[in-house]
Amino acid sequence: MKCLSLTALKIKTKEDVMEAIEKIKEELKGKEIELSSLDKDRTALFVVDMVNGFVYSGALASPRVAAIVENLAELNKRMKGYKKVFFLDTHNENSKEFCSFPPHCIKGEEEAELIPELKTEDSEGEEIYYVEKNSTNGFHAEGFKEWINKYEDTVDNYIITGCVTDICVLQFSLTLKSYFNEKNKEKRLIVPINSVETYDGGTHDGDLINLFALYNMHTSGIEIVDRIK
């Protein structure tokens, strides 16, 4: 995999920075994957934290995240019958994470529930896991440990979606990739740009941070595509 070298660009001025950003955008865009090209029995969909508290209501809800709901719901529908994991950010009132973030997604409250657009009534026969997580990295959740122990040898393609790109999606993706690298296992991790998003707030510019997170994953061997066709 050939990746853009920011060192080679010799960034010194604001114009150099803008040029580097445009080169990153160019490197990431224009790739698509046909869902039909992936073996259904060896492919799984991961949806990170598409809960009410990050989409519709609460201290961490973002309209940017709400904007990907339609794309994600459509992908979820097309992947009926595939293995799926829905990560649900879920905390108690004394969560250590609240030292870094405002209280959110308290267990038993509406914020911690999966958004209605992704709830599937007709799920009989589907292998769906709903994994509650108490940290920003779903890899460490007990429910995911159970899933990976069961499916590690039979799933080769991991489609990772959800929010937010630079925190929970990034941490899970990089940890999963390094986990497989450590074991010398060939697995495809795929992140569709139209199905991940982050937030705007203060110095956290959503467009810029989203781009840097995608590029971070790209340089780590994760496939970044415009969408899953």
What do the PLM-derived regions correspond to, one by one?
Residues 1-44, 92, 103-229:
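Active-site-adjacent betaalpha module
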Residues 41, 45, 58-91:
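A short alpha/beta connector and helix-capping loop motif
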Residues 46-47, 51, 87, 192:
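Generic enzyme active-site microenvironment
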Residues 50-58:
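Short acidic, Gly/Ser-rich segments with clustered Asp/Glu that frequently serve as metal-coordination loops
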Residues 58-65, 100-105, 134:
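Short glycine-enriched, charge-decorated loop/helix-capping segments at active-site entrances
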Residues 85-103:
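Active-site nucleophile/metal-coordination loop of metallo-enzymes that catalyze phosphate/sulfate
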